[in-house]
From Swiss-Prot:
Purpose of the protein: Contributes to multiple aspects of the viral life cycle including viral genome amplification, suppression of suprabasal cell differentiation and egress of newly formed virions. Induces host cell cycle arrest at the G2 phase by associating with and preventing the nuclear entry of host CDK1/cyclin B1 complexes. Inhibits cellular DNA replication by preventing loading of host replication licensing proteins MCM2 and MCM7 onto chromatin. Within the cytoplasm, associates with host kinase SRPK1, a splicing factor regulator, and inhibits its activity.
Gene from which the chain derives: E4
Protein family membership: Belongs to the papillomaviridae E4 protein family.
Basic and acidic residues: compositionally biased ranges: 50-78, 128-140, 148-163
Pro residues biased stretches: 20-35, 87-98, 113-123
Keywords: Early protein, Host cytoplasm, Host G2/M cell cycle arrest by virus, Host nucleus, Host-virus interaction, Modulation of host cell cycle by virus, Phosphoprotein
Gene Ontology cellular component terms for the protein in this record: host cell cytoplasm; host cell nucleus
Annotated localization: Host cytoplasm; Host nucleus
Main location: host cell
Protein name, as recorded: Protein E4
Subunit structure: Assembles into oligomeric complexes. Interacts with host CDK1. Interacts with host SRPK1; this interaction may favor expression of late viral transcripts. Interacts with host cytokeratin components KRT8 and KRT18.
Record's miscellaneous remark: The major E4 form is first synthesized as an E1^E4 fusion protein from spliced E1^E4 transcripts, such that the first few amino acids of the E4 protein are derived from the N terminus of E1.
Maturation and modification: Phosphorylated by host ERK. The phosphorylation triggers a structural change that enhances keratin binding and protein stability.
Superkingdom of origin organism: Viruses
Length: 230
């Protein structure tokens, strides 16, 4: 009995080894692909226009625009009339030239300004500008009121009065007390021009030195005032 069961068991194991496995079940069916909503099915990479055919109408329009620009015609805006160019006023005429028209050049009016001031009357024949004749020649010009009239008159008349006035003006300020004494004027009866000139030069030199000393004293006092705290 044991021997009869053993071969049957071995034959069953051989059948399991030689038996093929069952086939796998097929995969489930996949849903169809849906296109994107923003994609346009009519436009495809194969339907793109060629570069020669692209923008043929635009090239004609660009050429027409270039022609208009070369001609210089401005493009009028829709709803507006033609553009008016501003007109400039004509330039003023050039002033007349010539030797006898010197006064007329001053009378040219500039636009935007008032009339020129009253000009003096033209000189009479034989009269030079700045040198009047007749009664005006007899009267000397008025002396200036700035305090230097005496000095100029004194220099023209020999320098005696002008130099005395200058020295007196310095002493009135309180700084001319220690100045050098004025030199005695030369004797007019001698008639020596060289002595007169030498005396005047010495006097002018002394006055100049005194003026330099006064200026230096004023500057020293000024710097001292600046150096002292207020």
């Amino acid at each position: 009995m044991a021997d009869s069961k053993a071969p049957h068991h071995q034959g069953h194991q051989e059948d399991k080894q030689t038996q093929t496995p069952p086939p796998r079940p097929p995969p489930p069916p996949q849903p169809p692909l849906t296109p994107r909503p923003d994609a346009n099915p009519s436009i495809n990479s194969h339907n793109k226009p060629k570069p020669n055919e692209e923008g043929t109408d635009g090239d004609h329009q660009a050429e027409q625009g270039d022609r208009k620009r070369t001609k210089g015609d401005p493009d009028p805006d829709p709803g507006r009339g033609p553009v008016l160019k501003p007109t400039l006023p004509p330039p003023p005429p050039p002033p007349p030239t010539g030797p006898g028209l010197r006064r007329s050049t001053r009378l040219v009016l500039v636009p935007g300004q008032g009339p020129p001031p009253d000009l003096p009357a033209p000189p009479v024949e034989g009269e030079v500008e700045g040198h009047p004749q007749g009664k005006d020649r007899d009267h000397p010009p008025p002396t200036p009121q700035n305090g230097h009239g005496k000095e100029t008159q004194g220099a023209e008349g020999g320098g005696d009065k002008g130099e005395q006035g200058a020295v007196g003006g310095e002493s009135s300020d309180g700084e001319g007390d220690h100045s050098q004494p004025p030199l005695t004027p030369p004797n007019e009866s001698d008639g020596s021009l060289l002595n007169t000139v030498a005396c005047l030069l010495a006097r002018w030199e002394s006055n100049f030195d005194q003026l330099v000393q006064n200026i230096q004293g004023d500057l020293e006092g000024y710097w001292r005032k600046l150096g002292t705290p207020q």
